[in-house]
Curated annotation (Swiss-Prot):
One of its GO terms (molecular function) is RNA binding. The gene is RRP7A. This is Ribosomal RNA-processing protein 7 homolog A. InterPro entries: Nucleotide-bd_a/b_plait_sf, RBD_domain_sf, RRM_Rrp7, RRP7, RRP7_C, Rrp7A_RRM. It comes from Homo sapiens. Keywords: Cell projection, Cytoplasm, Cytoskeleton, Disease variant, Intellectual disability, Nucleus, Phosphoprotein, Primary microcephaly, RNA-binding. Belongs to the RRP7 family.
Length: 280
């Protein structure tokens, strides 16, 4: 019985790869030196009928169990044999179909996930997804022509990439602020158009507007407000300190008057005893 099981395993090693229901398994290795294989679980990305999706239907491959050393460039290269890859995006967890997709910033983004991830691979043609589902391995992530950095070399590269280019950073910030200002202007224009106009039920929305315009929430305005609050707080603390000092000085003055009064009393008693006291 044991010999029969060994014979079946030796004859059919790849066809018995356990994988989640509906997924195909693709074995990969970090390099040629690695003996054990790691498995990527892939399926065609799809959503329910009538639900909007961020990714194009029939051209997107959803990948599970992506190891940390497998980058977007590595996945694009590994799957390029199946067809032209349009884009690859790694994420911590799968996207909700209903959630709107926000453009990712090149500089202002959270730290990379230190663990296994999921990936969305978009091919230019649907045939790329079909070829990826039938792909056999093992595929090599790091090769001589396309080495993947690891260890201290990866740390050095990550540190160098963490220092942003000032000009590129300025361009991205300016672009974001222009889009934000345009959005605020559109919202204000829409609110102004709807002001005083009754809705379907006859209600009129009343918006309170101050006589003075609100300060723009810029960094300079925020710094001025903070400086004004600091001066007000320090002035209040200074006034409290002077009042406390005034009470202290008044108490010391009264103590000195009492001391001088006692000294004058003793001197008068001494002069009376010596019969030299002449008050006039």
């Amino acid at each position: 019985m044991v010999a029969r099981r060994r014979k079946c395993a030796a004859r059919d090693p790849e066809d018995r790869i356990p994988s989640p229901l509906g997924y195909a398994a693709i074995p990969i290795k970090f390099s040629e030196k690695q003996q054990a294989s790691h498995y990527l679980y892939v399926r065609a990305h799809g959503v329910r009928q009538g639900t909007k999706s961020t990714w194009p239907q029939k051209r997107t491959l959803f990948v599970l169990n992506v190891p940390p050393y497998c980058t977007e460039e590595s996945l694009s290269r590994l799957l390029s044999t199946c067809g032209l890859v349009q884009s690859v995006e790694l994420q911590e967890k799968p996207d909700l179909a209903e959630s709107p997709k926000e453009s990712r910033s090149k500089f202002f983004h959270p730290k990379p996930v230190p663990g296994f991830q999921v990936a969305y691979v978009v091919f230019q043609k649907p045939s790329g997804v079909s070829a990826a589902l039938a792909l056999k391995g093992p595929l090599l992530v790091s090769t001589e022509s396309h080495p993947v950095k690891s260890g201290i070399h990866k740390w050095i590269s990550d540190y160098a990439d963490s220092v942003p280019d000032p000009e590129a950073l300025r361009v991205e910030v300016d672009t974001f602020m222009e889009a934000y200002d345009q959005k605020i202007a559109e919202e204000e224009a829409k609110a102004k158009e709807e002001e005083g106009v009754p809705d379907e039920e006859g209600w009129v929305k009343v918006t309170r507007r101050g006589r003075r315009p609100v300060l723009p929430r810029t960094e300079a305005a925020s710094l001025r407000v903070l400086e004004r609050e600091r001066r007000k707080r320090s002035r209040k603390e200074l006034l409290n300190f002077y009042a406390w000092q005034h009470r202290e000085s008044k108490m010391e003055h009264l103590a000195q008057l009492r001391k001088k009064f006692e000294e004058d009393k003793q001197r008068i008693e001494l002069l009376r005893a010596q019969r030299k006291f002449r008050p006039y």
